From Swiss-Prot:
Name assigned to this protein: Large ribosomal subunit protein uL23
Protein family (similarity comment): Belongs to the universal ribosomal protein uL23 family.
NCBIfam families: PRK05738.1-3, PRK05738.2-4, PRK05738.3-2
One GO CC term, this protein: cytosolic large ribosomal subunit
Keyword set includes RNA-binding: yes
Pfam families in the record: Ribosomal_L23
Gene behind this protein: rplW
GO function term, MF aspect, one: structural constituent of ribosome
Keywords associated with the record: Ribonucleoprotein, Ribosomal protein, RNA-binding, rRNA-binding
Role: One of the early assembly proteins it binds 23S rRNA. One of the proteins that surrounds the polypeptide exit tunnel on the outside of the ribosome. Forms the main docking site for trigger factor binding to the ribosome.
Phylogenetic placement of the source organism: Bacteria, Pseudomonadati, Thermodesulfobacteriota, Desulfuromonadia, Geobacterales
Top-level taxon: Bacteria
InterPro entries per UniProt: Nucleotide-bd_a/b_plait_sf, Ribosomal_uL23-like, Ribosomal_uL23/eL15/eS24_sf, Ribosomal_uL23_CS
Length: 94
């Protein structure tokens, strides 16, 4: 899998900002077929940082109403990437 296909986008929320500041953990939306090894390699090469560990979560899509009809949002995968001491990623400077 191509490095640019593994990571879709960073997740920037209040929770992820607090984790980034306190635990040096950054969060990404990643491809559903990507494994932890591919995610680690992609983050290290694209952002030039050292990764300590990767945790992943499969997020189920919610059922939503569209007028009278019901539909389902797509399932997706979230990755919590713990960076080693001295490494950091600033999404707004990239």
């Amino acid at each position: 899998m191509n490095l640019y296909d593994v990571i879709k986008k960073p997740l920037i929320t209040e929770k992820t900002t607090i984790e980034k500041d306190s635990k040096n953990v950054v969060s990404f939306e990643v491809d559903r077929d990507a494994n932890k090894i591919e995610i680690k390699e992609a983050v290290e090469k694209l952002f030039k940082v050292e990764v300590a560990e990767v945790n992943t979560v499969n997020v189920a899509g919610k059922v939503k109403r569209f007028g009278r009809h019901y539909g389902k949002r797509s399932n997706w995968k979230k990755a919590y990437v713990t960076l080693k001491e001295g490494s950091s990623v600033d999404f707004f400077e990239i």
